[in-house]
């Protein structure tokens, strides 16, 4: 979960190895078209599962983005799991974004949940309620609670989330990923001082979404 210095996410290595092996076989038997196709596939998989280094801001009260992408929703909303009003920030990840998810703030996992569901286009707000998702409830040393939810999308149908209840997480570290286009919903306390607006591009582990009070 903390292999931040590995250039390719370990979850992608089987896919890279498989595509590279097929490429090699086609090269050996002399099928140039097939070899060229799978070389391109191999390069794309490496690109998709890339794991760039990130520099996390020093401010311990800062909540950093858990995902690379663009802010598609920002405003008060009812968080379904805790059943309370919170500030919601939704980030859309296209197939071209880095899909490794990072911890938004140093905290302990106090609860987690999984909801089976559909695989609708995650750019629609209905995906928050209808799509398959995995969520973590985080609590900081100061008792501040946040919820971060990985939402599967039309293409992304495989959510990877490593932490379990009781796990202590460090801000900016890897905690999971979603494959091939998806969405992250982050729920913050209502009094959080927001640092992003609709349409902003975010970088996981670096972009400050807000500052807790």
From Swiss-Prot:
Domain of life the protein comes from: Bacteria
EC number annotated for this UniProt entry: 4.1.1.65
Cofactor: bound how, per the entry note?
A: Binds 1 pyruvoyl group covalently per subunit.
Q: EC top class, in one word?
A: lyase
Task: Name positions with the PTM Pyruvic acid (Ser).
Answer: 182
Provide the reaction this enzyme catalyses.
a 1,2-diacyl-sn-glycero-3-phospho-L-serine + H(+) = a 1,2-diacyl-sn-glycero-3-phosphoethanolamine + CO2
A Pfam family this protein belongs to? PS_Dcarbxylase
The protein's topology relative to the membrane is:
Peripheral membrane protein
Listed under GO biological process in this entry are: phosphatidylethanolamine biosynthetic process
Q: Where, per UniProt, does this protein localize?
A: Cell membrane
Q: Which cofactor does it need?
A: pyruvate
Q: Recount the PTM note.
A: Is synthesized initially as an inactive proenzyme. Formation of the active enzyme involves a self-maturation process in which the active site pyruvoyl group is generated from an internal serine residue via an autocatalytic post-translational modification. Two non-identical subunits are generated from the proenzyme in this reaction, and the pyruvate is formed at the N-terminus of the alpha chain, which is derived from the carboxyl end of the proenzyme.
Q: Where is this site: Cleavage (non-hydrolytic)?
A: 181-182
Q: Name one GO molecular function term.
A: phosphatidylserine decarboxylase activity
Q: Pathway of this protein?
A: Phospholipid metabolism; phosphatidylethanolamine biosynthesis; phosphatidylethanolamine from CDP-diacylglycerol: step 2/2
Instruction: Give the positions the UniProt entry annotates as the active site.
Output: 182 (schiff-base intermediate with substrate)
For this UniProt entry, what's an example GO CC term?
plasma membrane
**This protein's UniProt keywords:** Cell membrane, Decarboxylase, Lipid biosynthesis, Lipid metabolism, Lyase, Membrane, Phospholipid biosynthesis, Phospholipid metabolism, Pyruvate, Zymogen
Under InterPro entries, the record lists: PS_Dcarbxylase, PSD-A
Q: What does this protein do?
A: Catalyzes the formation of phosphatidylethanolamine (PtdEtn) from phosphatidylserine (PtdSer).
Subunit info here reads: Heterodimer of a large membrane-associated beta subunit and a small pyruvoyl-containing alpha subunit.
Q: Which family does it belong to?
A: Belongs to the phosphatidylserine decarboxylase family. PSD-A subfamily.
Q: Which HAMAP family match?
A: PS_decarb_PSD_A (MF_00664)
Listed name of the protein: Phosphatidylserine decarboxylase proenzyme
Species whose genome carries this gene:
Geotalea daltonii (strain DSM 22248 / JCM 15807 / FRC-32) (Geobacter daltonii)
